Amino acid sequence: MRGAHAYFSGSGNIRLHYRCWDVPTPRAVVIVCHGLGEHGGRYEELAQDFARAGLSTYALDHRGHGRSDGRRGHVRRFTRYVHDLEKFRRRVYGAVGPDLPLIFLGHSLGGLIMIRYLQEYPGVPARGAVLSAPLLGVAMEVPQWKARLSSILYYAIPALPMNTGLDPEVLSHDPQVVEAYKRDALVHDRITPRLYGEIHSEIDQAFAKVSQLRLPVLMLIPSADKLVRPDLMQRFAADLRRKSPVQVRTFAGLYHEVLNETTRSSVVADILGWIERRIPEHSGSPPAAESAS
């Protein structure tokens, strides 16, 4: 199955690109939010896995990413991402219908966007959210001088393009994944002082408003993540568990992109098993009870 390409108008009328992998009679639809510097096309293999399970997949390219318009790695306000996602959800519902069960899946920056979206739109009719290594704390060491400079540039030159310093080798143990990432013309390594500052501010907001996220959550935590702190993912899951059903899967020794690791088949199986419990035979029926673990 080949994904189709389309565009729509995001917040502020920016042109945003998305891909969709529709199955003939879907049992549910999954909305995917990608990470910093990448794009929705990198989730094609996952979309194929979902298609075989009867799930349609829609993957947005965030503004400043992939085929979407906008300066690479820049956003004036993080809330733009959040509002873009709501407009995208409405677009997806217009295509598949509002009665189809909806699942969210967000990776890294996309996970943070999804958390803040679900906190700001608590009434969204979704069955649950899969958070893959959500950006809840940066593991990469940032020199103190660079952090101070970014704080100044946040106001002085907010759109100044800077290098993220991301090493593709720490994304996955699979050399083919790493090489494909390096060769991908739609991948970028840019971040601006404004986006850097907005990310840190929104991480604080995610923890402060954890009780506002009321959906069932599957948290995927790679223990050897060198980009996002696993301990803060665990802390967020523990805080969230007070209000919402949360299942945590920790993957020993895996790097940041658990969906692209050498053992991805077992990760995908975990996701599909969790989704199955969220979408009973009759979409109008209440989801099956799930124990937190």
Where is each model-derived feature located?
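N-terminal cap/lid segment of alpha/beta-hydrolase-fold proteins
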Residues: 1-23
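Active-site glycine-rich loops that stabilize anionic/oxyanionic intermediates
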Residues: 27, 35-38
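Catalytic nucleophile-loop/oxyanion-hole region of alpha/beta-hydrolase
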Residues: 37-40, 66-96, 100
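Short beta-strand/loop motif that positions the catalytic acidic residue
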Residues: 213, 219-221, 225
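Short alpha-helix in the alpha/beta-hydrolase fold that links the catalytic acid
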Residues: 215, 229-239
